[in-house]
Every structure is written in C-alpha cells, then in structure tokens.
Amino acid sequence: GDEAIRNLDENGIIRIGAEVGPESILVGKITPKGEKELTPEERLLRAIFGEKSRDVKDTSLKMPHGERGIVVDVKVFTREENADLSAGVDKMVRVSVAQRRKVMAGDKMAGRHGNKGVVSMVVPVENMPFLEDGRPVDIILNPLGIPGRMNIGQVLETHLGWAAESLGFRAITPVFDGATEEEIEAELARAWMINEAWRVTGDKAWEWLESVKAYSAEDLKDDEEARLIYLANVLANTGIDVQELMGNRLLARRQAMNMWLKAEGYDPALITAFPEDNIPVSERSAQDERAVRACLDLWANSLGKELDLNQSLEELRKAAQQIMLETGNPVPTIGKQILRDGKTGDRYDQPVTVGYMTFMKLHHLVEDKVHARATGPYSLVTQQPLGGKAQFGGQRFGEMEVWALEAYGAAYTLQEMLTVKSDDVVGREATYQAIVTNKPIEAPGTPAAFKVLVKELQSLGLAVESIMEDGEIISYGKESDRRDNRMPTGLLDSRYGA
C-alpha cells in the first residue's frame, strides 16, 4: 500500500532519515515469475489483446524481523562505476540503518582488564548508593570479579581515576611501566586533602556570606558559587587573577587547598605535585611521602585523634588503620569511601572502593540475542533443529545441561529434550498432533541420532539390531524391519528356521 512505499524515492530506494521497523521496505524490487507454456486458447487471447502484464513477485529488500532504526546512509553501486560487482548484477544498493539504545539488563560491558560482565539490573538514580556529599555512583561491580581473575589493575585504575578527577590531571600509565602503588597512594592522599579543603571552604564561605549580608541564599545557584565568591574575596589582594578564578573550578580548588594547608601549618610547596610543578624525578619520592604523612595527620585530627609523626611511614599506616577500625572511617590512602544505601540512607557496614574507571559497552546486546522458536527448520543429516538466531534455530541442550536434569531426577523432561523436542521425527509429529487435537501424548520413538550411529557402525561392517522391552527385534537394513521374536528361549536363532 501507499503507507509501505511513502518513504521511497522515484527509484524505489528509501530516503535518508526515514524511520523503519520490521518488514519495512528499504529498496522496492519486483521479479517476473517464470513464463509457463501457454495453452492454444491463451496464445489466441494474447494475440488478440496484446502482451498482458506478466505475473511478478515482490522481492523487495526489507528490514529483518525484530529490527528498527533510522536510515543514515544509502549507497548505490552501478557496473559503470564498480567493475567488481558480481556476475549478473547491474546495480547494487546498500542501506545503512542506525539505532540508539540504552543499556538494559542482559547487555555486556567490559573494562580494560578483561573484567567483562553482564548488566543484571538497571535502577533509578535515586536508588543507587551515594557518597557522603550526595553524589550517586554510576555502576556497581561485583567484588568477586577480582580475586578469581587476579587482575588488580582494575582496582588501581579506579584509585588513580578518583585522584585524577579530584586533582584535575590526566594519568598516562603504560602497561607494566605505569604508576606504582606508592605513587597512587600519594595521589589518593592529595585527592583527600583537596576534597577536604573544598568542603571546609564551603563551610567558611556560608559563614562569611551570613556575616557580610551581601548575598541571600536565594541569589546563589549552589555551594560552588558560594565558594567561588568567598575565594575571590579572600584572594583579591594576593595577586591572583580573580576573573580567571571565577571561571576555572580547578584553579579555585587548588587555591582552596593551598589556603587550607597553610592554615593547618603545612607548606603546600612540599606536598602538592601538579603536572605544571615540574618536580625533579629524584625528589618525587620524598614529596609523595610528605603528602601521605600530612594526609594521615590531618585525617586523624579531623576525627579528634592524634598520630605520632616521628614514627616511620609503615608504623604511621598501622596507627591510621587502628583509627579506621575504631571509628569506621576509611583511611584516605586506601581508596575507599563511606557509601550510603540509596533507599534507606543508612551507611553500609564496610567502606567501599569508589573511583573512576573506563567501562565500555560491548557489541553483544541482549536485544540482538533474544530469540524464541516454536517449530522451525531441521538439519537434513541429524534431523535436529538448526542452531542460532539467524537460522531460526533451537537452543542447544548440551551434555552439561543433561547432567543438570539428571541431577534433578527430571526423567520425563529429559526424555522430551532428547526425543520429541529434538530428532525423533515420527514422535515430534505425533506429539504436535496430540497437542493440537487435545489427546494424550504417546511414548516417544527412536531418535534419528541413533539411526545415524547405526549407519556409521554398518559402514564399519557391524550389523546392529535393537531388542525392545516387549521382545520385538528391530534390524536396520535398507528398510528398517520389525518382527516378533518367535523363539524367546534362545536355543535357536529364529531367522534361520528350526
């Protein structure tokens, strides 16, 4: 009808931008049916009335079943321009259809460490676990994916990603020659300090705004704007470009960190390590250790605890871990955060590793893989259903699946799987008829796979016969032969007479 061809141009090719669904025509095409021998009467009628329009069949290119999308490209290849077209092809049309999909349960995703997995659930953002500052996490990975594969790289990437996002740098770590665990620990320490400084600056900003009465809370967009106004006021006479500060969040965070460290009695130049600082390689290790020590000291102070800074770094770490066990607050340098349940708002009983990781969507989408079959094509050799979605095939019920049914003791289900649902040709037809006519299903027969096995054995020169429960013998020759066993005593072979 007109609806089916409304998006086709004068050549019968679909236009770019058209929305298409299952069975939509992409390229209109008709093929004449084979000319049959005409009767004398038909020849007379054709001679009188002229050549009638011959019978044609519709052979249009259509969208496959279950597919949809928008046409993004159409290419037409002709023999004049493309001499490498197949023999007998004058014109070829290639239509590209694209579709946008959201991630859904069953889609496959993977990181860069072989940590692939399948999405098990997609939930509203308000139900996702969230950090203390209210930010929800994007994706939750099962921790069992780490000890089994022992790919610790994904944890280190998460830690370094968190530090890089907090401090505003880009990490480039070649395989086997990237950041060491000590360097990542130092960056996590600096990340905690800049985040803590930003939090403290926010508290001070609101106190200052409250005292000067220059702004009302309604005038400000959020905490971020309050911090920037406060920093611009405090740093106005220090030679810093206030205009640049207001437009550059990263610069503002770094200035807040420097201010906070000075207020706490530390020299920022001995702790921070931003890319533009160009710290010599020989001094980086000492700079990193100072950063870790300062972080642990400031973290302990924020919890009302004291650390002895004269201890070695290893002893300092152990003391910090003891504080963590007492208070339930994770040490900043281990890369874990306090998470809260999205539904209840309660803290989880253990700190959780949170960070930034590259995660990719693989080209194994559940929408392409979902498939169902009632009856369909069968293999000519085995008489079993074909395999795969493309052939409209069945699901393979393999050896291990058979073990599972055996373990459950599901004898009748297993018998069905191996006979009428598979390659018992007579049995599946009889079962179908019984279901349609609402009659009892008969006992299954012999699977075709057994007959194939018998033929293989016969090719080796081995004669095979089946003896049924009722004593009936089935021999497999050119035509399968059924007969009664007349002498069940076994004294004489009934085939050769008495």
Spans of model-derived segments:
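Long insertion/accessory domains within large nucleic-acid-processing enzymes
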Residues: G1-A498
